[in-house]
């Protein structure tokens, strides 16, 4: 079993799939740790979300999802107009467009993002998107 760690996918599904192919990622046996920032910038935020959601269902505890700052900003933008404006400046519209293109209401999918961890720790390492708050 390999452990595959990815981060800052930012809606770039094709590049993510390419990295997984190069690494020989096997969702049947490997462990996957995503260090966050699934959304924004790239054109396929919905595809990235859908792929990880499917993998989490299939892999269970072998798929660790850590919250990134863009994921957090996206989640909070639905409740705070200041955060929404910041999200739009950080290419949040590309995420909204991607979800709308698939007739999927992003706000209704927020529960899945709330299940992400702030960090993951095993006997060898601590995995985090950018830093730990003390």
Predicted regions and their residues:
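Beta-strand-turn-beta hairpins that frame and shape the catalytic cleft
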Residues: 1-4, 120-126
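Histidine-centered divalent metal-coordination motifs
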Residues: 8-10, 69-70, 129
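Active-site neighborhood of divalent metal-dependent phosphoester bond hydrolases
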Residues: 41-123, 133-134
């Amino acid at each position: 079993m390999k452990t595959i760690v990815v981060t800052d996918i930012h809606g770039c599904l094709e590049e993510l799939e390419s990295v997984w192919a190069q690494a020989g990622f096997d969702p049947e046996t490997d462990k996957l740790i995503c260090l966050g920032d699934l959304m924004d910038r790239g054109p396929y935020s919905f595809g990235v979300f859908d792929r990880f959601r499917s993998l989490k269902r299939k892999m269970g505890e072998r798929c660790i999802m850590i919250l990134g700052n863009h994921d957090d900003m996206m989640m909070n933008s639905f409740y705070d107009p200041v955060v929404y404006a910041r999200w739009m400046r950080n290419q949040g519209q590309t995420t909204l467009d991607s979800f709308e293109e698939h007739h999927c209401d992003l706000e209704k999918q927020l529960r899945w993002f709330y299940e992400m961890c702030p960090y993951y720790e095993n006997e060898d390492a601590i995995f985090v998107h950018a830093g730990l708050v003390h």
